[in-house]
Amino acid sequence: MSHLRPFAALSLAVVSALALAGCATATEAAVDASGAEAETISFTWDRNVAGEGEDAAYEETTVVVPKNPNNVVVFDMASLDTFGALGGEIAGAPLGSAPAYLSDYLSEDAFNSGTLFEADLIEIEAQQPELIIIGGRSSALYDDLSEIAPTIDLSIRGSFIETLERNTTFLGKVLGAEEEAAEALAELKDGIEEARAVTADAGTGLALMVSGGKLSAQAPSGGDATGRNARGGLIYDVFGVTPVVDDIEAATHGEPISFEFLVEHNPDFLWVVDRDAATGTEDAQPAATILDNAIVELTTAAKEDHIIYLNPTAWYIVFGGLETTRIMIDDVLQIAK
């Protein structure tokens, strides 16, 4: 099997061995259906069993999964990205949400496993998967899916970079592609450093989500890219953009703001995610149309042609994974052109 799918060329480096909090893996031996010994690997994480945010309750969960599994079902798009980029093939996924740029990672006869929020349990059980991967929006499906097959949750927890390293390293072990995983991570680390070098001299920025004709500002995450802080945390904390405002309220889709807010704080760059484009909202006005008005034209970002439209699928739907992180890097590097 050729493990690593092609990436855009970025400089390579060597990634050191990773030992990340909240994740533990161990290779074990098991017996498969034919009676032959089969290798397995375990994954440990703190599973959210109740509540959200400060009220969330967690339970340490360890799941043993087979190496080189067959009939893998993936609900988490970032995991679909990484699993496929490392040479794995996905048998089932929420096909209505899988982006076109990841379609090559699906088997030719891939089945629809449901949506990002709801699983087709009957169809999944009929396909007899050996591994199910969830994360983010699909995390709540764990109890039902774990009754069908070994199920692991690869949601972002804390640092975006540490999560990317943890998940890529683990999936590399599952697929026997450890070296390829390390090389891919090195490539992305170099790309992120290149992007940070560009943003270091770019003045201030504001991460902005546009949806339904309304604007919302994204908050810096303080290093925690989980949940409500995710998108702003990435542009500021990972890619080094200096926030024009520090005290934005952390919310699932950001803090609602007016067009006048943009003039008042006047960032040098606007980093825009078009949520309606990401979700395929019918008859929605594009973010570029919404921002093409007399008020926005008063901002430095508009005058200097510094309104950067980020890939909406990568930044809103997938949000992680090897190929998607490369797309994010390229989005940020637009300002160097």
PLM region spans:
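Bacterial Sec-exported substrate-binding components of ABC uptake systems
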Residues: 2-15, 19-77, 180-209, 277-284, ...
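A short, structured surface patch at a secondary-structure boundary
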Residues: 71-126
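Alpha-helical, coiled-coil/dimerization segments enriched in small aliphatic residues
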Residues: 97-100, 219-254
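Extracytoplasmic substrate-binding proteins
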Residues: 147-215, 306, 315-337
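Ligand-binding pocket segment of bilobal, Venus flytrap-like solute-binding proteins
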Residues: 234, 250-279
